[in-house]
A protein has these predicted regions:
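Membrane-interface loop-to-helix entry segments
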Residues: 122, 150-201, 215, 256, ...
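C-terminal membrane-solvent junction of multi-pass transporters and transport-like membrane proteins
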Residues: 147-150, 162, 341-353, 387-438
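TM-loop-TM module centered on a large, flexible mid-protein loop between adjacent transmembrane helices
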Residues: 87-88, 94, 126-136, 212, ...
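A generic transmembrane alpha-helix motif of multi-pass inner-membrane proteins
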Residues: 199, 377-383, 412-470
């Protein structure tokens, strides 16, 4: 009989299974559609210089994350435990790798995602209230210029408020997420419909044509994939709620795959409309592409309403990141592999209050220090290292545990994880070359966790649970 998985504590009843298939799909869509699709088209357009290449980057990104979704669906169904990849990596590659993922997620991925979404929310506010972007002071630290605006403290307050909301029950959180997801998908469909009906009347110019593919073009595509991957990020987070999903062996794979396909379709349609309605140069220069599209179609009043809807969308994604992210340090602390306070649960609501306060505090500090673009580049590099490791863990588990019960098996194995691994390696290497300082910071956070692992791994509780041995 196989040994207990990391974080295999479902018999304790610590967490509540209160999320059905509808809530799970809403979480995937709501977590994935945050601020990215409304904002990053300009970054991608500047990177590749062609509307066609922007769309190709979105399609490539969708294909890559679909391969990853198949991997996460198999592992999530096989190990429906709190912590997601913390469990998969610990079982497939060994306790150190599971721990380093949890460390990276707790100190970098989730706090940065929270801060980025809050910064995106404030960026939408700036469209309605330009005073939000008013510089307060600036300073030079080495070769880096730091500008502090009113946006940073506002983003910090948003992080604190959403973290506080997540003290409430899982079922309530699922219902809220269904509502917010319906609003954001409805908003995107309205943009698409308006662009299809009225877009050709407003298109001012065509984008530069593609004359040939070269190494420079491929490098530009990889650069454009960085913001696209930020926009697609979220499909992988559902597994963190494995102990709170009803019939997880069935519902985790369905929700991940169906949710991601829906997101990809919406993203492609929205970006087609962006370039249909606006001249390419305006898309490349605009910090608020979606708002500019709606303003072109319906005037300033329509753009204002869209901006409010996009701000709500960012809040919805922020809610999911907090909801799912807190389960990772909670699962680690429960296994004796994190700070003990992160194991604390609310006595009646059964929410991981210690982990919530921990993540919220780090995210609030990050929100004070960086802008939207600076934060997501730091985030993507570290996350995609572990995406590649999850693909390796899937292959290793197929080899060393062939009899493991797998309610869902990844389509196209072994090519699915191999191609996903290759894509993850290409993306991280390119990002290191393009943004070496921020990539180095991300890697440094990961490496910093190693001495903590060897300190905590000596605890009796950690030695028996996390190694995955009989």
């Amino acid at each position: 009989m196989l040994a207990s998985n990391p974080s295999d504590h479902s018999e304790r009843g610590d967490l509540v299974r209160g999320l059905g298939l509808g809530s799970a799909i809403a979480i995937v869509i709501g977590d994935t559609i945050g601020t990215g699709v409304f904002l990053v088209a300009s970054d991608m357009a500047r990177a590749v210089g062609s509307a066609t290449l922007v769309l190709i980057a979105w399609i490539l990104g969708l294909l890559i994350v679909l391969l990853g979704a198949f991997c996460y669906a198999e592992l999530g169904a096989a190990f429906p435990k709190a912590g997601g990849p913390y469990v998969y990596l610990g079982r497939g590659l060994g306790p150190l790798w599971g721990f380093l993922f949890g460390w990276m997620s707790s100190f970098l991925e989730r706090p940065v995602a929270m801060a980025t979404l809050a910064a995106g929310f404030v960026r939408f506010l700036g469209f309605l209230f330009p005073i939000v972007a008013t510089p307060l002071f600036s300073s030079h630290i080495g070769g880096y210029e730091f500008t502090f605006t009113t946006a940073q403290p506002i983003a910090t307050v948003i992080v604190v408020m959403v973290t506080a909301v997540n003290y409430f029950s899982v079922r309530m959180g699922g219902a809220i997420q269904v509502l917010l997801t319906s609003l954001k998908t409805g908003t995107m469909l309205v943009i698409v419909a308006g662009g299809v009906v009225f877009g050709t009347k407003h298109a001012g110019s065509t984008a530069p044509a593609i004359t040939s593919f070269s190494l420079g073009t491929i490098g530009a595509l990889l650069t454009a994939l960085v913001p696209a991957m930020w926009a697609y990020n979220g499909f992988n987070d559902l597994g963190d709620l494995g102990e709170e999903i009803v019939q997880p062996q069935k519902n985790i794979p369905r929700a991940i795959i169906f949710g991601l396909l829906a997101v990809g379709g919406l993203y492609l349609m929205a970006n087609l409309v962006y370039f249909l309605v606006l001249p390419f140069a305006q898309v490349a220069a605009s910090p608020h592409v979606a708002s500019d599209v709606v303003q072109s179609l319906s005037g300033s009043r329509g753009a204002a309403w869209l901006t409010v809807a996009m701000a709500v969308s960012a809040l919805g994604a922020l809610h999911v990141v907090v909801l799912t992210g807190a389960r990772i340090p909670y699962a680690m602390a429960r296994d004796g592999l994190f700070f003990g306070f992160a194991e604390r649960l609310h006595p009646s609501l059964r929410t991981p209050t210690g982990a919530l306060v921990f993540l919220g505090s780090i995210a609030a500090l990050l929100a004070l220090t960086g802008t939207f673009e600076e934060l997501y580049s730091l985030f993507v590099f570290a996350v995609w290292i572990f995406f590649g490791l999850v693909a390796i863990a899937l292959i290793r588990l197929r080899q060393k545990e062939p009899n493991l019960v797998r309610p869902y098996r990844a389509w196209g194995y072994p090519w699915t994880p191999l191609v996903f691994l290759a894509a993850a390696m290409a993306l991280t290497v390119n990002l290191w070359m393009v943004r070496p300082v921020r990539s180095s910071l991300g890697l440094g956070v990961i490496v910093l966790g190693i001495p903590f692992f060897y300190r905590w791994h000596k605890r009796p509780r950690a030695a028996g649970i996390h190694c995955g041995r009989n």
